[in-house]
Amino acid sequence: MTYDLYIGDRTFSSWSLRGWLMLHKFDLPYRAHMIGLYGGTMAADMAPLAPARLVPALRTPEGDVIGESLAIAETLAERHPNAGLWPAEPAARIRARWLCAEMVGGFGALRGGCPMQLAYVDADFVPTDAIKADLARVETLWAFAREKAVDGPWLFGAYSLADAFFAPVCARIAGYNLPVSDAAQAYCHTTL
């Protein structure tokens, strides 16, 4: 039962990094296929996966294609209920889903102003007020998650999909030397 995961370069593609972490960190069997995000071949590379048009995309062992990170997350959690993709405790699971949904649709200033990259640190970057507001929201959500955390360094104690979804935020915090609390810095250090 091996999945086929279609992603771009995880060094620069936050969505590809999330897709990869969803399988890799939970030891789910997969083959990674690289999509040419930056080489002009993306449309052709994605054509066999239609109607999926963005990364990550996942093909199940049965041949079904899943596009969009949240759909992939829910499908994997449903198919592997004992893998611990979501927190076991119901209230923590509710919060984890909420955080992932907000991650997918939010933080536009942070995304736009600090493109995800794992290749270097821009120590001289000066964040805008909008980026600082996004960072404040991230810290609020992380504190909200930790209220339901059991023992462990991750957002909900044990590693979960919420950590996979926020890993690129940690990459941005580290890569642009963004101003966050000591607790947020510690979480990012654990994540990276």
Task: Give, region by region, the residue ranges found by the protein language model.
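GST-like domain detector, emphasizing the conserved glutathione-binding G-site
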Residues: M1-T128
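GST-like fold's C-terminal all-alpha helical module
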Residues: F107-L192
